[in-house]
């Protein structure tokens, strides 16, 4: 690394130029000090003026001498080689204070992320090409003879089947109580009470979960007219965090062909919060971090992590 950087640079002249810059700064400082102090007390006005002018001229000569020396050394320093393998970005890693210059590591991370994104995009493109629709020109032109769209059967499940799925999930977890209601027609709404830890309002569309709101056990989950409140957030930051993680879990557990498995998997994940205030973080081993318990639960192992420790 040192040999690469030394190509084309006279290090001895470079060192002398640094000392010359320091000397030039000292000379300029003496000039301004002379102007600041003015004429010193002497026997007569004429003597004071001559002493002041003489001292001022000497200081200016020193500035001129140091400036000429700096110009001479600058011509001897030379220029660094332009054949550096990483060009200017390679110099970012030379600063030993990594906390002040994290740009180099961020560039490497962005490069790895870009390669991974390109790899996954290629896989997705191959899968989509296998499932591409083949339509002829005649089929595209005759819109009146098209077959009517068939609605997915999973969106039109009978209420009895949904009630049976929720009832079986309720029996699976004794510490979890699930209350089902249909205040707006066929769409079900669930009030899940997990021990004496928290309550969850779940809005469903058939067997698909649309929205979840997590609140504390002692918080009110009803509106003034007695209906479940599906809009207001919890007053506590810990349950707001759990609400965000539950929304992420809904995006993770996706299996449109088997919606009952999705609901059961989500409820199993939600049940892991029974020890929200008792389980330590599996990464740092602490119960609290920034005043909050471990609010994240791994989707596969259900282990507890702080939001910053799960990265």
Swiss-Prot record:
Any one GO molecular-function label of the UniProt entry: transcription coactivator activity
Compartment(s): Nucleus
Organism superkingdom: Eukaryota
Pfam families in UniProt: Med27 (PF11571)
Position of the signal peptide: none
Alphabetized UniProt keyword annotations: Activator, Nucleus, Transcription, Transcription regulation
Principal cellular location given in the protein's record: nucleus
Gene Ontology cellular-component terms listed: mediator complex
Coiled-coil positions: none
PANTHER family: 34 KDA TRANSCRIPTIONAL CO-ACTIVATOR-RELATED, MEDIATOR OF RNA POLYMERASE II TRANSCRIPTION SUBUNIT 27
Job description of the protein: Component of the Mediator complex, a coactivator involved in the regulated transcription of nearly all RNA polymerase II-dependent genes. Mediator functions as a bridge to convey information from gene-specific regulatory proteins to the basal RNA polymerase II transcription machinery. Mediator is recruited to promoters by direct interactions with regulatory proteins and serves as a scaffold for the assembly of a functional preinitiation complex with RNA polymerase II and the general transcription factors.
Subunit structure of this chain's protein: Component of the Mediator complex.
Protein name: Mediator of RNA polymerase II transcription subunit 27-A
Lineage of the species this protein comes from: Eukaryota, Metazoa, Chordata, Craniata, Vertebrata
């Amino acid at each position: 690394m040192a040999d690469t950087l030394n190509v084309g640079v006279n290090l001895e002249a470079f060192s002398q130029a640094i000392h010359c810059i320091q000397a030039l700064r000292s000379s300029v400082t003496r000039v301004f000090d002379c102007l600041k102090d003015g004429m010193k007390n002497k026997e007569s006005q004429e003597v004071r003026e001559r002493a002041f002018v003489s001292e001022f001229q000497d200081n200016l000569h020193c500035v001129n001498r140091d400036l000429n020396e700096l110009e001479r050394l600058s011509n001897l320093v030379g220029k660094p080689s332009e054949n550096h393998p990483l060009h200017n970005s390679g110099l970012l890693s030379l600063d030993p204070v990594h906390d002040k210059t994290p740009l180099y590591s961020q560039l490497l991370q962005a490069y790895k992320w870009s390669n991974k994104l390109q790899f996954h995009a290629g896989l997705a493109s191959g899968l989509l090409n296998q499932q591409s629709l083949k339509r002829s020109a005649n089929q595209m032109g005759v819109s009146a003879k098209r077959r009517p769209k068939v609605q997915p059967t999973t969106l039109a499940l009978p209420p009895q089947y949904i009630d049976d799925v929720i009832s079986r999930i309720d029996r699976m977890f004794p510490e979890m109580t699930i209350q089902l209601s249909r205040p707006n027609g066929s769409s079900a709404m669930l009030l899940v009470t997990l021990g004496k830890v928290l309550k969850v309002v779940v809005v469903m569309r058939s067997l698909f979960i649309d929205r979840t709101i997590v609140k504390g056990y002692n918080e009110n989950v009803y509106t003034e007219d007695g209906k479940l409140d599906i809009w207001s957030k919890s007053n506590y930051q810990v349950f707001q965090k759990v609400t965000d993680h539950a929304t992420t879990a809904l995006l993770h557990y996706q299996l449109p062909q088997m919606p009952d498995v999705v609901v059961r998997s989500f409820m199993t994940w939600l049940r892991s919060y029974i020890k929200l205030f008792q389980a330590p973080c599996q990464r740092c081993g602490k119960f609290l971090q920034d005043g909050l318990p471990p609010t994240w639960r791994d989707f596969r192992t259900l282990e507890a992590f702080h939001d910053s420790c799960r990265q």
